[in-house]
Amino acid sequence: MSNIDVKQNWKRWYPEEIFLKNSKNKKKYFWNLYKLTQQDFFTNNENKKNSNKLKKTDELKDYPSKEEAYNLAFKSGIEKKEEKKILFNDNLNKLLSNFEAAISLFDQMLFTRLLKTILIISSYIVGKNIKMDELILLKNVKKIINNDSFFLKKKQLIIHPNNKKFLEKIIKNSVYSDKWELCYDVNIDINGCKIRSENGDIDNTIEARWKELCRLVSEEC
């Protein structure tokens, strides 16, 4: 064998520290050294091995068995599932509540807008800002005189001043023969009229029809 091989394979060796197993009886052992055997000593490595074994033993004692670990994992999984279920139900309830509130708000807004649309259309149909239609006015007046004059006492026919000449010319004889008193009011619409008597009042103006329309719509709501 060459010197090179010897140098390469050479490893430095250190003697191990040796300790007495029962260190309390050191004095006794010193007086009886000839009685000591190999079993009375231990090295540092053996001490480490024993310590590691003790640690592993303690860890095994603390570590749960497979069945216990399975039960713990199963219980933990159930709890997490229940938490997710509760969270899901809460979110679902919130979503349904918000949806119900949104639908209710939508219905309310839709109803309000629909009502406004109806009122606007009705106002165009029966609005005040229209031209006088002699046929409409004459029809309304004749209807009231023919149907209601028998039941009315001290009756007054109230019309717009602009219709004075027209009505006096057309129904003059009927008005005076039935003892009607013609009265004029600028606040009455051009195609409307009112009847005032001791028995009661009859309002055949656009304003009255408009109020009645609003009342009927409100009752439907």
Swiss-Prot record:
GO terms for cellular component: bacterial-type flagellum; cytosol. Keywords: Bacterial flagellum biogenesis, Bacterial flagellum protein export, Cytoplasm, Protein transport, Transport. The keyword Membrane does not apply. GO terms for molecular function: cytoskeletal motor activity. Disulfide bonds: none annotated. Its main location: cytoplasm. It is found in: Cytoplasm. GO terms for biological process: bacterial-type flagellum organization; bacterial-type flagellum-dependent cell motility; protein transport. Pfam families: FliH (PF02108). The keyword Magnesium does not apply. Needed for flagellar regrowth and assembly. Belongs to the FliH family. PANTHER family: FLAGELLAR ASSEMBLY PROTEIN FLIH, YOP PROTEINS TRANSLOCATION PROTEIN L. This is Flagellar assembly protein FliH. It comes from Buchnera aphidicola subsp. Schizaphis graminum (strain Sg).
